[in-house]
From Swiss-Prot:
Annotated gene: purB
Name this polypeptide is given: Adenylosuccinate lyase
Subunit annotation: Homotetramer. Residues from neighboring subunits contribute catalytic and substrate-binding residues to each active site.
Positions that bind N(6)-(1,2-dicarboxyethyl)-AMP: 4-5, 73-75, 99-100, 218, 269, 274-276, 282, 313-317
Natural source organism: Deinococcus radiodurans (strain ATCC 13939 / DSM 20539 / JCM 16871 / CCUG 27074 / LMG 4051 / NBRC 15346 / NCIMB 9279 / VKM B-1422 / R1)
Family membership: Belongs to the lyase 1 family. Adenylosuccinate lyase subfamily.
InterPro entries: AdenyloSucc_lyase_C, Fumarase/histidase_N, Fumarate_lyase_CS, Fumarate_lyase_fam, Fumarate_lyase_N, L-Aspartase-like, Pur_lyase
Pathway(s) per entry: Purine metabolism; AMP biosynthesis via de novo pathway; AMP from IMP: step 2/2; Purine metabolism; IMP biosynthesis via de novo pathway; 5-amino-1-(5-phospho-D-ribosyl)imidazole-4-carboxamide from 5-amino-1-(5-phospho-D-ribosyl)imidazole-4-carboxylate: step 2/2
Pfam families: ADSL_C, Lyase_1
UniProt superkingdom: Bacteria
Keywords: Lyase, Purine biosynthesis
GO cellular component terms listed in the entry, alphabetical order: cytosol
GO BP of this protein: 'de novo' AMP biosynthetic process; 'de novo' IMP biosynthetic process
GO MF, one example: N6-(1,2-dicarboxyethyl)AMP AMP-lyase (fumarate-forming) activity
Catalytic activity of the protein: N(6)-(1,2-dicarboxyethyl)-AMP = fumarate + AMP; (2S)-2-[5-amino-1-(5-phospho-beta-D-ribosyl)imidazole-4-carboxamido]succinate = 5-amino-1-(5-phospho-beta-D-ribosyl)imidazole-4-carboxamide + fumarate
Length: 435
């Protein structure tokens, strides 16, 4: 991911040096288990731990690996050679009985686990901001729109409550996907443990609080990674849904809410008046990326026989970029919603703009329930006057009052056009969330 869209945590997490630190953690964990079983000298493991703590792998080590790999054309071989040069004779026990993918896949799971943890925290923060705004605007009336057209009154807080509920489901998916990669694979070249005991894998997994992969070939099955990418892609659609709503609400014709606009900020190089929804447009773009990463992740599932490396080049891009994109976009949207500028007066004005058309269903029910009219006849009266209101701009209540076929009295019309009728169950909805 380019630096422009990297959070500080993701930049460190997906650095080359940190990748090699994860590789070393796998190697040392395996070595520790092997030492317990007398397969390698315990003092070799102890010495390597001491040296790695005193001289941790850094950017210089990553550059050293790159230089060796330019000759070997094999990253794990370059890694183990660089370890030997850095830590000395004891490093010869590194990689004992393992194959490259044992280290790469298990270490990649360490990085994915940490990345998913960061994203889950980000989403929890976004959810809390939605809860805060839902509470603040619980009783702020706004017109609900279906197909982009005014439908019926609702409250602005219900939008946030809907988003909060969706984020709860996202969190469930993210947690499940994170668990799917909390597995250790140390099973050898084709998954038969030919040169390493299954006990080593099991003990490493237990020491991390993870599980040993029950069966593998040379790689972990890529449906696990696809599930991670799917959870991130679905999160992206949630972020996009929220972002698109804010973009629509900021339109000049609507202007019910808008992104924060900082002091000194400019909206256009040529039009000084512009305040564009650039932050939520940015989030929309990340959602598109996340769906694209998923498509590639699904392609990676079907590998040849016990493995090929067609997935490798793709994963080196999509896993860091997908997790980085999800984290960045979530944090960006969190900032937008936290500092969202809301215009309740404009919301009321927009509610009134169509001259009461948003109350048409209440009138329909009054004719059916209170006056005993057949639905078709009642619908005809309301629709005829509603269409006239669309065409002339006259208020629906005034048109109905003047319609000789309308049996509703002034008091009954007042009741039908009562805004609070539409909002009377808002408290019940909030109660489902303990609010």
């Amino acid at each position: 991911m380019i630096d422009r869209y990297l959070t500080p945590e993701m930049k460190v997490l997906w650095s080359e040096a940190n990748k090699y630190r994860a590789w070393l953690k796998v190697e040392l964990s395996a070595l520790q288990a092997q030492a317990r079983h007398g397969e390698v000298p315990a003092e070799a493991h102890a010495a390597l731990v001491q040296k790695s703590e005193a001289d941790p792998l850094d950017d210089a080590f990553a550059q050293q690996v790159a230089e060796i790999e330019a000759v070997t054309r094999h990253d794990i071989v370059a890694f183990t050679r660089a370890l030997t040069e850095r830590y000395g004779e004891e490093a010869r026990f590194i990689h004992h009985g393992l194959t490259s993918t044992d280290v790469v896949d298990t270490a990649q799971n360490l990085l994915l686990d940490e990345a998913m943890g960061l994203i889950i925290t980000d989403v929890q923060t976004l959810r809390e901001v939605c809860r805060m705004q839902a509470a603040a605007h619980k009783h702020t009336p706004v017109v609900g729109r279906t197909h982009g057209i005014h439908a019926e009154p609702m409250t602005f807080g219900l939008k946030f409550l809907n988003w909060m509920a969706t984020l709860d489901r996202d969190l469930e998916r993210l947690q499940a996907a994170r668990g799917r990669v909390q597995v250790v694979m140390l099973s050898g070249s084709v998954g038969t443990y030919a040169h390493v005991s299954p006990k080593i894998e099991e003990e490493v997994a237990e020491s991390w609080g993870w599980h040993a992969a029950p069966v593998t070939n040379q790689t972990l099955a890529r449906d696990r990674h696809a599930e991670v990418l799917a959870a991130l892609a679905i999160l992206g659609t949630t972020l996009e849904k929220i972002a698109v709503e804010i973009r629509h609400l900021q339109r000049s014709e609507v202007r019910e809410a808008m992104e924060p606009f900082g002091k000194g900020q400019t909206g256009s190089s040529s039009m000084p008046h512009k305040k564009n929804p650039i932050l939520t447009e940015n989030v929309t773009g990340f959602a598109r990326l996340l769906r694209g990463f998923l498509a590639t992740g699904l392609e990676n599932v079907a590998l040849w026989h016990e493995r090929d490396i067609s997935h490798s080049s793709a994963e080196r891009v999509i896993l860091p970029d997908a997790t980085a994109s999800a984290s960045y976009a979530t944090r960006r949207l969190t900032g937008v919603l936290r500092d969202l500028v809301v215009f309740p007066e404009r919301m009321l004005k927009n509610l009134d703009d169509l001259g009461g058309l948003v109350f048409s269903q209440r009138v329909l029910h009054a004719l059916i329930d209170d006056k005993g009219m057949m639905r078709e006849a009642a619908y005809g009266i309301v629709q005829r006057n509603a269409l006239k209101s669309w065409e002339t701009g006259e208020g629906l209540r005034d048109l109905l009052k003047a319609d000789p076929e309308n049996p509703l009295s002034d008091a009954e019309l007042d009741a039908a056009f009562d805004l609070q009728w539409y909002l009377r169950h808002v408290d019940d909805i909030y109660a489902r969330f303990g609010m």
